[in-house]
C-alpha cells in the first residue's frame, strides 16, 4: 500500500446540501475523535469527522481511504451555460445502469493479505523498530531518522548481544531493504534548480541526506564555473576556527535584528535561510493564481504529529495534527529538543524565495566563501534561472571572501535589485537543470529483494563524482512539506539507451569497406555501359524531358546544397534525376561515389519506381538500386540508390541523426504535403546546417515549388516541362452535352427538397421539379443580358435562371439538367454514360485505356457492380472491356494488373482512388474521368475525432489527374464539376495533412530525436513549413499526458520513450507493453497488428449477409477484438495443415489471407521491437522467428510460456484493451424497463437493439457500425464499451468495440479513482464522475483503491526498468497474480 497516501477518517453524517455552499459537517462518533467533521465543499454536501485508524486496517467498521484531493463530478448546470455556448450532450439523468463493485470473501482476504505484506515491507524499511502497530499504519516510507542526530550529540550505544543467545540467527541472512529515494527529497532539491535525475542519483549516493546531496551538487556545479577560485589559500588554513565561529555568530545576530523572522538559523552555525519577497520575479513569471483553501479545524482538540516531533513531517502546514513541541520530548534513549526549523521557514512565513547559506564542518567563513543557494517554490520560475542566480551570488561571495568581509546582507541587497537579476533570466538553459547524458536508473519504490528480479546492469554515471564532500549528518530533514506529491521522475531507462545504440550500429559507416565496394561498382558500371541492353534503354531515357536538363541539374548541385526541381507529370524526374547523380559519381573516383536515398509517399510507388529504375540500368532490383518499406527490404551492400517510404527514413534518423555515409536525400512528391514529408523537411533543414556535404533535392509539381524554395532560404528552382500530348479538358456541362445525359425524376442524384428556398416552395405548391424547371425555362425567354450572379455563389445554390445567366452559350437542356442535379454527389449514372460514349461513341479521339478517379473503395464497388449489369462492360456477349479496381488495400500483385496492356480491340478501364494521381504512372491511359472528389482525413481537435470525409479536389489535384491522360497520344479529361467551380471554388492546394490529423505520434517522434529533445513542442512545430493549429497541438499534448507518455513540462516519460520507439499509434503501443507485463503477449500482439494494419474480415459485394453471419460465429464476450483473435487462432491452426487448408479456411470464413499474413509479419516485427526495449526475450529477430515457425507466425513459441501464461484468459485481454484504449469509452443507455405478463408474474423484456443509445463523454450520441459484432446486441452485461477509433461519415460511428466490466475500468482506467459517500453508499468514480460504480461496502472500495495504487506503482517501476522480471519477483508477481484473479473471477 502506498504510504504516501494519508488515511482519513470516515465521513460523519454531514448536513451539507448540494448548493454552492457546503453545510456544516456532523460530529464523528468514534471513540478517538479529533474534532468535528469539516463543512462540505461547494455543492458537495457536508463533510464527515475524522478519527484515527486502528491497527485493524481493513475491518468493516474501520475507516476507508480516499485520495487527498477528491474531485467532484463535473455536472453541467444551466447557470453555467451562456447563450452562445452549446449545451453539453452528457446529462446526469442518463439511463445507464449503475453497477455494483463486488468482491468475494476469498478475494477480499487475498487482497488484505497482499496489502498487509506490502505495507509491512514499507513500514519495516522506512520506520523505527519501536513503533507500535497503530503508528506503523501512518508511517511514511521516507522516514528513517535513526541516520540523523543533532550536531554535537551521539546516539546511545546498545550493549553487545550474547553470541550464544543468538547463535540460532547466525545462519539467517538479515533483511537489507533496497534504499528508496524519497520523492519529496527529490522535489526539495529540484527547487534549487537541479534536474530531478541528478537529484535522485546524488540522494542515492548520499543515503538520502538532503543536506549532503545539496552541498555536493552545489560544489560540483560551482567548481565547473569558478574552478581555481574555490581553492582555500594556505593563509586561510592558519586562521583559528574559533575566530571564524565568533564572527559568524555576530553576523547571525545582526541579520536577525535586520531581517527579523525572515532570518532563520536552521542548524546552528551550519545553515542559514533568509525569506525574500521578490515581487518583480513573481509578477514576471505569474501564470495563474492558486486558489486559497480554507480550514475549519479546532486546533486544541488535535493530537501532536509524531512525525513533526521526529523532524520529518512531509505534510507540513497541511498536516491534520498539531505541530507543537512539548517541553521535554523523549525520543528513544536520547532526551533532546526537536529541531523544527524545517517547518518554521514555511509555516511562520510563506516565502516564495529563499536565500540559503551553508557552512561545512570546519568552515572558515568569512575568510572562505560559503555555499550559496537560491531556493524557490514558484513553479513558474525556470530551474536554470535559479542556478544562474546562485552562481551570480556565489561569484560575489568569492569576491567578498578575498577581503574577509561578511557577505550575506550584500547578497540580500543584490537579490532585491531587479536590474541585476533580470539580466540572468534571459538564459533558460543550464547544464545542471537539464538531464545528464547518462545516469543511474531510479530505484523502484516497490521493494524487490529477490536477486532474480533484476538483471545484472553496470550503471554508467557520468556526473556523480566518486568523492562526496565531508558533511556532518546533522538532524536535517529537508523534505518538502507539500502534500501534492512529487513531480514525475523522468528516466531514460537503460534498455532504451541500448536500443539507440543498436539502431546506431545498423548505420555505422565504415569508409574503408565502402570505398572498396565502390571500386567494384564503378568497374561493373563501366563494363555495363558498353552492353547493347544498356545502350538501348539509354536511348529511351534520353528522349525524356528531364534528360535535357541533366547538365543544368548537375551544375546546380555542385554549387548549391539544396535544390528544388519542379516537373510536370511524365517528365521523368522520379526515375532519371537520381540516376543522373549516381552515373555522374560512378564516372569519378570510388571515394566520391554517391549514396542516394529517395523517399516516396507510398509503398507501391517505392517498389514500382525501384523496379523500373533497376530495369533501366539492366540489372535486377537489390543491387545498385533497391527499395525499403515497412516489413520489406530489397537492398544489399552494393545499393547506392535506395527508394524508401518517408517513414523509413524518419525511423533511421532516430538512430542516425547525421545520416552517416549518405550523400544525397531526394524527397519526391513533396507537394503532396503529407505529415511525414513536412516533418522530414524540418529535420533536413536542421541537418544541412550541420552537414555541409549532404545535398537535398526536393521534387515537386509545378504549382507550389516556390513555397519550398522560400523555406530553404530561396534555394534555386529548376522547372522541367512535361512530355505529354495535348489533353482536351472538359467540365460537367460538357459531359452532359456530349452524352445527352438527362436526369430522371426521382433520381438519387437530384437536389433534395431542402435545397429549394421556402419562397419557391410556397410558389411551387404541388408542382414537380420538372414542372418547376419548365416554368423557369419559359420565364428565361425574357431574361435580360445584364442579369448576372456573383462569382462567389456556388452553382449548387443557383436556380435555372441564375445558371442560365452564368453559363452563357450552354444549351438550355443542359442547364435544365444542371439546375436539378446535386453537385455534392458523385454521379455514377453520368460516369457510366461517359464510359459508353468513350467505348462505343463516335468521336475522333484514339483508342486507349480509361482511368476513372473515385473517392473511395465504396464508390469503386458501386460503379463496378453497376457496370456488371451493362452488357457493354460485363463481357457476357463479347470481350469489349476489362475492368480493374485500384486501391491501396489491394496486394502488390493485384495492383500490378493495371499495368498490363490488354489485347487489341479491348478497352482497359481502371477504377481508382487518388493512388493513381501521382504515385504510379499507367502509360496507355488516354481518357480520364475525374469525379472531382477524394477521401480526406479530417481531425476535430476539440472532440478528438477523426473523420474520413468526401471533399472536392484542389486545382493542383485536378491538374495532376488531367496529366495522367495523353502519355501516348492526344488525351481527354472530363472533370465532373463545372468550369465555374474549377475557377472560383476549388482551393489552389490541398490543405497540408499535418493541419488535419492528430499529432500524438509526431510529438513523440520529435521528442525522441536528439536534435529536438530539449525544445518545447510549440517551438518545433512553429518551424514547420506550414504549422498546425495550436488547438490541435494542445489537444495532442493533453492526450499524451493522460496516457502517461509526456510530462507537463513536455518531456518523455519512460512509457513515452517506449511508445516513441514503436512505429504504431500510441494506444496500440501501450497495448503491446501491457500485454508483455501481464503475460498475455501473443494475443495482445495479434490485436495490435490488426489495429495497426486492418481487419482481416472481408465482406464480398454479393455476400454481405453471409459474411456478417460468419463473423458473428467468432463473436465472444461482446468484443470485436476477441472475435478477431478467435479468427486469427483458427487461421494459425489451418496453416499448420498446409497452404490448401489455410486457403479453404479463409474462403469459408470470409477472411483475407493477405491481411492475415501481413498481421503475422507485423507481429514478428513488434516482437523484435519489444525484445530490443526489454519487454520480450532478448535477441529475438523477426526473420529468425519466421524461419523457425512451423505454421502460423511463430511468436508464441519465440516469446515463451512465461510471457503467455495468461494468453487464454479473455477477461484479462479485455482488461489490457481497457488499459490501452481508455478514455475511449462509450456508455450504453438502456430504455426504461418494459414488462410482460406471464403465468408466473411480470417478466422484464429485453429492449430492442435499436432502442439502445450509445454516448461518449465529449461527442454525445454515436452509433455502432453495422460491421461490428455488437451491432444487433440487445443487452450488455456491462454498460461500457471500449473503442479504438470514431469515424464520421453520414453519422458518427464506432467501428470496432469491446464490452468492458467493472474491475478493468477501476484498475486500468486512467486518471484518479475517487471514492465518495453518497446517500449511504460508497460510490467509486472515474473521469470526473462520468463513470460510476457502487461499492458493495466501504471495505471493498478501500481495498480496490489501495490495490490500484500498488498496481500503478508497479507498472511505473516496470516501465522505468524493463529488466525487472515480474515472473520471479515476489512482490511484483503477487500483485500481478492478484489483479489477474480479480479481473478473471469478479
UniProtKB/Swiss-Prot annotation:
The keyword Signal is assigned to this record: no
Record field: compositional bias (Gly residues): 12-23, 35-50
Domain UBA: 180-220
Chain positions of motif DEVH box: 668-671
Stored SUPFAM superfamilies: CCCH zinc finger, P-loop containing nucleoside triphosphate hydrolases, UBA-like
Chain intervals annotated as zinc finger (C3H1-type): 299-326
InterPro entries xref list: DEAD-box_helicase_OB_fold (IPR011709), DEAD/DEAH_box_helicase_dom (IPR011545), DHX57_UBA (IPR042615), DNA/RNA_helicase_DEAH_CS (IPR002464), HA2_WH (IPR048333), Helicase-assoc_dom (IPR007502), Helicase_ATP-bd (IPR014001), Helicase_C-like (IPR001650)
Keyword line: ATP-binding, Coiled coil, Helicase, Hydrolase, Metal-binding, Nucleotide-binding, Phosphoprotein, Zinc, Zinc-finger
EC number: 3.6.4.13
Coiled coil (residue ranges): 101-125
Function as written in the Swiss-Prot or TrEMBL entry: Probable ATP-binding RNA helicase.
Family membership: Belongs to the DEAD box helicase family. DEAH subfamily.
Protein name in the entry: Putative ATP-dependent RNA helicase DHX57
Organism, scientific name: Homo sapiens
Amino acid at each position: 500500500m502506498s504510504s504516501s497516501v494519508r488515511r482519513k477518517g470516515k465521513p460523519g453524517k454531514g448536513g451539507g446540501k448540494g448548493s454552492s455552499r457546503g453545510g456544516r459537517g456532523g460530529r464523528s462518533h468514534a471513540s478517538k475523535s479529533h474534532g468535528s467533521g469539516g463543512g462540505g465543499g461547494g455543492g458537495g454536501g457536508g463533510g464527515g469527522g475524522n478519527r484515527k485508524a486502528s491497527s485493524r486496517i481493513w475491518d468493516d467498521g474501520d475507516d476507508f481511504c480516499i485520495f487527498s484531493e477528491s474531485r467532484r463530478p463535473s455536472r453541467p448546470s444551466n447557470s453555467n451555460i451562456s447563450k452562445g455556448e452549446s449545451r453539453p450532450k452528457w446529462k446526469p439523468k442518463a439511463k445507464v445502469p449503475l453497477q455494483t463493485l463486488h468482491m468475494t470473501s476469498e478475494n477480499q482476504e487475498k487482497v488484505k493479505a497482499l496489502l498487509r505484506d506490502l505495507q509491512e515491507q514499507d513500514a519495516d524499511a522506512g520506520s523505527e523498530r519501536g513503533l507500535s502497530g497503530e503508528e506503523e499504519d501512518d508511517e511514511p516510507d521516507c522516514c528513517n531518522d535513526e541516520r540523523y542526530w543533532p550536531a554535537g550529540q551521539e546516539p546511545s550505544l546498545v550493549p553487545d548481544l550474547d553470541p550464544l543467545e543468538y547463535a540460532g540467527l547466525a545462519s539467517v541472512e538479515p533483511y537489507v531493504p533496497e534504499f528508496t529515494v524519497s520523492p519529496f527529497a527529490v522535489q526539495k532539491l529540484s527547487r534549487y534548480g537541479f534536474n530531478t535525475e541528478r537529484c535522485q542519483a546524488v540522494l542515492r549516493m548520499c543515503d538520502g541526506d538532503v543536506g549532503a546531496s545539496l552541498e555536493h551538487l552545489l560544489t560540483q556545479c560551482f567548481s565547473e564555473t569558478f574552478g581555481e577560485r574555490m581553492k582555500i589559500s594556505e593563509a586561510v588554513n592558519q586562521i583559528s576556527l574559533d575566530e571564524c565561529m565568533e564572527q559568524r555568530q555576530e553576523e547571525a545576530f545582526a541579520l536577525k535584528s535586520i531581517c527579523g523572522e525572515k532570518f532563520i538559523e536552521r542548524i546552528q552555525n551550519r545553515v542559514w535561510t533568509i525569506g525574500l519577497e521578490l515581487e518583480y520575479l513573481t509578477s514576471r513569471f505569474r501564470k495563474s493564481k492558486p486558489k486559497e483553501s480554507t480550514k475549519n479545524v479546532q486546533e486544541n482538540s488535535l493530537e501532536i504529529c509524531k512525525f513533526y516531533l521526529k523532524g520529518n513531517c512531509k505534510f507540513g502546514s497541511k498536516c491534520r495534527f498539531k505541530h507543537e513541541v512539548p517541553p521535554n520530548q523523549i525520543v528513544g534513549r536520547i532526551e533532546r529538543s526537536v529541531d523544527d526549523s524545517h517547518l518554521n521557514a514555511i509555516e511562520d512565513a510563506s516565502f516564495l524565495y529563499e536565500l540559503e547559506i551553508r557552512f561545512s564542518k570546519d568552515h572558515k567563513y568569512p575568510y572562505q566563501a560559503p555555499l550559496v543557494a537560491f531556493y524557490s517554490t514558484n513553479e513558474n520560475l525556470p530551474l536554470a534561472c535559479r542556478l544562474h542566480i546562485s552562481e551570480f551570488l556565489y561569484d560575489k561571495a568569492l569576491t567578498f571572501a578575498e577581503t574577509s568581509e561578511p557577505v550575506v546582507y550584500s547578497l540580500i541587497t543584490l537579490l532585491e535589485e531587479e536590474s541585476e537579476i533580470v539580466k540572468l533570466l534571459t538564459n533558460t538553459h543550464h547544464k545542471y537543470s537539464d538531464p545528464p547524458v547518462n545516469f543511474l536508473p531510479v530505484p523502484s519504490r516497490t521493494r524487490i529483494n529477490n536477486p532474480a528480479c533484476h538483471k545484472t546492469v553496470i550503471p554508467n554515471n557520468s556526473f556523480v563524482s566518486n568523492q562526496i564532500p565531508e558533511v556532518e549528518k546533522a538532524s536535517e530533514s529537508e523534505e518538502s512539506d507539500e502534500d501534492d506529491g512529487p513531480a514525475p521522475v523522468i528516466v531514460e531507462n537503460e534498455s532504451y539507451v541500448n536500443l539507440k545504440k543498436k539502431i546506431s550500429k545498423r548505420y555505422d559507416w565504415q569508409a574503408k569497406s565502402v570505398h572498396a565496394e565502390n571500386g567494384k561498382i564503378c568497374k561493373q558500371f563501366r563494363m555495363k555501359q558498353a552492353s547493347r541492353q544498356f545502350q538501348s534503354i539509354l536511348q529511351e531515357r534520353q528522349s525524356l524531358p528531364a534528360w535535357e536538363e541533366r547538365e543544368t541539374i548537375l551544375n546546380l548541385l555542385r554549387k548549391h546544397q539544396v535544390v528544388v526541381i519542379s516537373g510536370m507529370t511524365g517528365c521523368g524526374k522520379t526515375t532519371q534525376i537520381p540516376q543522373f547523380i549516381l552515373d555522374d559519381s560512378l564516372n569519378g573516383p570510388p571515394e566520391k561515389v554517391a549514396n542516394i536515398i529517395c523517399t516516396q509517399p507510398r509503398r507501391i510507388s517505392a517498389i514500382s519506381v525501384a523496379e523500373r529504375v533497376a530495369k533501366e540500368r539492366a540489372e535486377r532490383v537489390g543491387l545498385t538500386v533497391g527499395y525499403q518499406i515497412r516489413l520489406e527490404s530489397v537492398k544489399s551492400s552494393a545499393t547506392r540508390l535506395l527508394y524508401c517510404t518517408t517513414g523509413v527514413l524518419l525511423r533511421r534518423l532516430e538512430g542516425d541523426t547525421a545520416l552517416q555515409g549518405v550523400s544525397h536525400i531526394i524527397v519526391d512528391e513533396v507537394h503532396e504535403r503529407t505529415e511525414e514529408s513536412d516533418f522530414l523537411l524540418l529535420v533536413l533543414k536542421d541537418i544541412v546546417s550541420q552537414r555541409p556535404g549532404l545535398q537535398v533535392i526536393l521534387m515537386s509539381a509545378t504549382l507550389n515549388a516556390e513555397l519550398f524554395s522560400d523555406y530553404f532560404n530561396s534555394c534555386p528552382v529548376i522547372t522541367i516541362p512535361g512530355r505529354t500530348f495535348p489533353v482536351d479538358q472538359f467540365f460537367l456541362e460538357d459531359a452532359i452535352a456530349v452524352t445527352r445525359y438527362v436526369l430522371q425524376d426521382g433520381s438519387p442524384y437530384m437536389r433534395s427538397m431542402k435545397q429549394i428556398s421556402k419562397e419557391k416552395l410556397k410558389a411551387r405548391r404541388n408542382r414537380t421539379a420538372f414542372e418547376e424547371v419548365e416554368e423557369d425555362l419559359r420565364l428565361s425567354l425574357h431574361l435580360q443580358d445584364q442579369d448576372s450572379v456573383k462569382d462567389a455563389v456556388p452553382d449548387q445554390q443557383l436556380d435555372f435562371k441564375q445558371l442560365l445567366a452564368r453559363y452563357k452559350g450552354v444549351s438550355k437542356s443542359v442547364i435544365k439538367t444542371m439546375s436539378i442535379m446535386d453537385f455534392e454527389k458523385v454521379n455514377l449514372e453520368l460516369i457510366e454514360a461517359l464510359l459508353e460514349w468513350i467505348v462505343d461513341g463516335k468521336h475522333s479521339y484514339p483508342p486507349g485505356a480509361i482511368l476513372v478517379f473515385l473517392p473511395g473503395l465504396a464508390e469503386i464497388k458501386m460503379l463496378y457492380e453497376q457496370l456488371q449489369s451493362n452488357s457493354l462492360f460485363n463481357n457476357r456477349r463479347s470481350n469489349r472491356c476489362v475492368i480493374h479496381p485500384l486501391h491501396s488495400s489491394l496486394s502488390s500483385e493485384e495492383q500490378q494488373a493495371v499495368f498490363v496492356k490488354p489485347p487489341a480491340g479491348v478497352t482497359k478501364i481502371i477504377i481508382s482512388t487518388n493512388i493513381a494521381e501521382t504515385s504510379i504512372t499507367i502509360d496507355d491511359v488516354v481518357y480520364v474521368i475525374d469525379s472531382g472528389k477524394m477521401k480526406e482525413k479530417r481531425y476535430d481537435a476539440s472532440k478528438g475525432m477523426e473523420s474520413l470525409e468526401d471533399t472536392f479536389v484542389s486545382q493542383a489535384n485536378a491538374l495532376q489527374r488531367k496529366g495522367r491522360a495523353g502519355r501516348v497520344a492526344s488525351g481527354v479529361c472530363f472533370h465532373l464539376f463545372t468550369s465555374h467551380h474549377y475557377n472560383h471554388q476549388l482551393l489552389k492546394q490541398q490543405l497540408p495533412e499535418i493541419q488535419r490529423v492528430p499529432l500524438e505520434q509526431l510529438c513523440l517522434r520529435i521528442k525522441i530525436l536528439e536534435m529536438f529533445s530539449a525544445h518545447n513542442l510549440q517551438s518545433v512545430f512553429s518551424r514547420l513549413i506550414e504549422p498546425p493549429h495550436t488547438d490541435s497541438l494542445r489537444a495532442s499534448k493533453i492526450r499524451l499526458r493522460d496516457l502517461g507518455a509526456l510530462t507537463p513540462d513536455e518531456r518523455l516519460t519512460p512509457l513515452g520513450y517506449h511508445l516513441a520507439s514503436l512505429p504504431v499509434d500510441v494506444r496500440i503501443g501501450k497495448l503491446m507493453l501491457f500485454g508483455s507485463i501481464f503475460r498475455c503477449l501473443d494475443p495482445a500482439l495479434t490485436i495490435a497488428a490488426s489495429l495497426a494494419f486492418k481487419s482481416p474480415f472481408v465482406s464480398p459485394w454479393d455476400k454481405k449477409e453471409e459474411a456478417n453471419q460468419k463473423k458473428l460465429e467468432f463473436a465472444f464476450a461482446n468484443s470485436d477484438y476477441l472475435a478477431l483473435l478467435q479468427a486469427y487462432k483458427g487461421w494459425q491452426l489451418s496453416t499448420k495443415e498446409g497452404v490448401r487448408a489455410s486457403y479453404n479456411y479463409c474462403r469459408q470464413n470470409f477472411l483475407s489471407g493477405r491481411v492475415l499474413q501481413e498481421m503475422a509479419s507485423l507481429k514478428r516485427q513488434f516482437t523484435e521491437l519489444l525484445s530490443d526495449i526489454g519487454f520480450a526475450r532478448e535477441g529475438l529477430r523477426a526473420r529468425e522467428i519466421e524461419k523457425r515457425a512451423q505454421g502460423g507466425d511463430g511468436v508464441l513459441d519465440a516469446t515463451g510460456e512465461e510471457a503467455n501464461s495468461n494468453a487464454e484468459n479473455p477477461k484479462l485481454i479485455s482488461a489490457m484493451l481497457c488499459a490501452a484504449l481508455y478514455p475511449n469509452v462509450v456508455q450504453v443507455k438502456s430504455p426504461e424497463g418494459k414488462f410482460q405478463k406471464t403465468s408466473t408474474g411480470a417478466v422484464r423484456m429485453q429492449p430492442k437493439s435499436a432502442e439502445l443509445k450509445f454516448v461518449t463523454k465529449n461527442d454525445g450520441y454515436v452509433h455502432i457500425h453495422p460491421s461490428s459484432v455488437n451491432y444487433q446486441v440487445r443487452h450488455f452485461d456491462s454498460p461500457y464499451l471500449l473503442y479504438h477509433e470514431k469515424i464520421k461519415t453520414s453519422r458518427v460511428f464506432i467501428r470496432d468495440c469491446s464490452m468492458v466490466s467493472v474491475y478493468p475500468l477501476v484498475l486500468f482506467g486512467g486518471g484518479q479513482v475517487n471514492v465518495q459517500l453518497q446517500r449511504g453508499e460508497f460510490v467509486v468514480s472515474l473521469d470526473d464522475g462520468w463513470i460510476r460504480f457502487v461499492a458493495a461496502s466501504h471495505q471493498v472500495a478501500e481495498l480496490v483503491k489501495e490495490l490500484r495504487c500498488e498496481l500503478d506503482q508497479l507498472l511505473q517501476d516496470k516501465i522505468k526498468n524493463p529488466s525487472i522480471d515480474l515472473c520471479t519477483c515476489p512482490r511484483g508477481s503477487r500483485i500481478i497474480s492478484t489483479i489477474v484473479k480479480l479481473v478473471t473471477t469478479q
